[in-house]
Amino acid sequence: MTKRDRTIYSCDACRSRKIKCNRQTPCASCHKSKRDCVYTVSRQRDAQITNRKLDKKTYHQISAIEKKISALEGKKGLLQVETINFNKSFTDQTPLVELQSLFPYLLLSKQDPGCVLVRHHCHHLLEKDPRYFEYSQLLADLSLTKRHHLTARAKALLGEAYIPSPQEGHTIDQLKHVLSLNPNFRFAGNFADPLTSFFSLIPPAWANKQLVDTFFQHIYPVIPIIDETDFNTSINRVLGPQIDGHYINSFPSIGSADDLPFLALFLLVLRISYMYTPGACPVSYDTLRAAETIMKEFDITKTHSLTALQAEIMLRFYKIVAPESYTQSNYVQVSVGVLIQNCYSLALHRDPEYIGEHNPKQQHLRRKIWHLLLRMEVIDSAIFQTILSSNPDASDTKLPQLIDQAPPMEQSIVKHIWRSTDLFVSLRKLVEINSKTSEDTPLETVLELLVEVETKLQAFLATIDSEASTVFYNDLVIFSVNFLLVYMYYSLYLFKGPTPLGNKYLLKSAQILFVDLARTRSTSLFLAYFNLNYIHLVLMITNFLRMRVDCIIHRHLRAQDSSVQDLQCCRYFLKIIFFSHVKELGNYSSSHKYAWQMRKVYLTLAKIMERSSDVLISNDPELVKSAAVDIPVKEINKLLEQYINFKGFTPTTLFDPTDNELIDEMQHENLWNAMENIEYSEKVYSGWIDAIKNVPSNWDWDYWDFLKIS
């Protein structure tokens, strides 16, 4: 028989003396005799008896180990979990603010010790010349004689295509005539009264049919928010009959208020399609301005129709990716927020089945619009670090379903929405952590989420097929996810500092930037916007690294250490990459305003970095010392050399331009100044506000805010 494991109710002292115990703590007997009152269960008592039988040495060893275990278990609860906040300084935990991001991920420039030196130096330069960043450094030092010579030569070379500078005193009509020689910037009609001049703004009917077909064949997969059949039906109803491919009406047929946003939507579809495939029958820039004029009639405080929401989404899409636009984070934040709130007012966050919508086509359309906007704001947040406006917990809208006998393109779009859903769910969690300011996040949570996003990205890539209709959508997802991964891993490197783990994060960020993203290519006009953001990311990171390398070389030379060969090689590679991309921005500047704005900033930084010793002298030695920490230079050199070979870059110069290069630079500057003057002078105001329309607009950047350290 085995003994029963009884529970002991008497304390050890009373049990050993075989007296009655009142079972208190302490019991009456122990209290009276001032003894320790201990209640030991039978198994523990057996262990005590066993311990007595052991030799004293072994017993003391076991007791010491038990005490250490108890002490460690006590400390375990006191250990602090390592946390991170991406919106606070990693050195002193002060809040970091970037009120108006000129370019994506500028918060990194306030975290990186090397770039902090550059920001301090730029601040000193701006104190001397507040407009230091506002002009091209290639043109800044030109003498008046040289400028006159270049202007005369440009007029001789370009003839009518020469774009005059604001100082040459041309009228707005003369500027529009010159710019109209560029197919992207044709002007036509009175966009301030889009109904009266509607048919003068658009091409003939035969050309419009081709443009609409182009939209649904190539652009629709990226922004599938309209139904092709309904759209073509509305075109015929509103624009009226045709004879020999030309409209015969002189005024659109407006049957209801909903036809106004349809006209704006139609104008935007034409302009987007033309920018995708410029042809013999151009769609003027005024079609965009006419669409904007129409949409101003829809007050954001009122509930809109679904058609108005579609037009708003299309307008926002165009303004972000259009070559003549320049998008900052404040516009991205406000515009997507308004769209999300309009979706709530139209109940798009509730599944159509639950609100009495039984038309399968409308159900499908409403679901696509809602889930497209959810993805759109996550992509915006991943790139511009904007705050999410939607609440997925308040939505029960199902994913779009595959429809029997649907066109292959529509089936492919639905499949890609399903395939990318898991990835966007994880990406959303990551951007929420990135934008969190009120509390820190456990570092382990961030690392687990990064692994999850990378795993799901690879799973998404494995599902990609060769269908041309979905190429843009795939690239859009790949770009936005990898952009954020570069930012997050580089932030983790700055957080961990010069440690083996920190260096691992630096190499991970560099691998994605210089290898994974370098292989993502697209010739789409609309993805040129993402290509430009990629160039910005490369320029920003290479500038950080170059300043850090200069600081390390400075430290070695002061210590009379001549072993800087790898560091000098790294600086050489970084300079090749930086100069080559700044030159590439010059090629983009003839058609993309964003590229021109970016080129001015990075030309200035290139000029500053050519005299990096001035940066070191103008900064506190302790700041220089903090930037002079070692980096895994050999591993970085391999990635940089591989990137240079892949891109075909060769050593080039920036600050010894030929006359033709200077003429190009002047023409780019004149182009965007002329566009700004035209837009400002012809801006459409309400009648009561016309009296103050001559007040200068505040369109320039606030460089002082840009250079604030915190």
From Swiss-Prot:
Any single biological process term in GO: positive regulation of cell adhesion involved in single-species biofilm formation
Transmembrane segments: 475-495, 525-545
DNA-binding region positions on the chain: 11-37
Record Pfam families: Fungal_trans, Zn_clus
Alphabetical keyword list: Activator, DNA-binding, Membrane, Metal-binding, Nucleus, Transcription, Transcription regulation, Transmembrane, Transmembrane helix, Zinc
Main localization category: nucleus
Keyword match Zinc: yes
InterPro entries, alphabetized: Fungal_TF_Env_Response, Transcription_factor_dom_fun, Zn2-C6_fun-type_DNA-bd_sf, Zn2Cys6_DnaBD
Membrane topology annotation: Multi-pass membrane protein
Described purpose of this protein according to its UniProt entry: Transcription factor that controls the expression of CDR1, the major multidrug efflux pump. Required for yeast cell adherence to silicone substrate and plays a role in virulence.
Protein name per its UniProtKB record: multidrug resistance regulator 2
Organism listed in the record: Candida albicans (strain SC5314 / ATCC MYA-2876) (Yeast)
Gene: MRR2
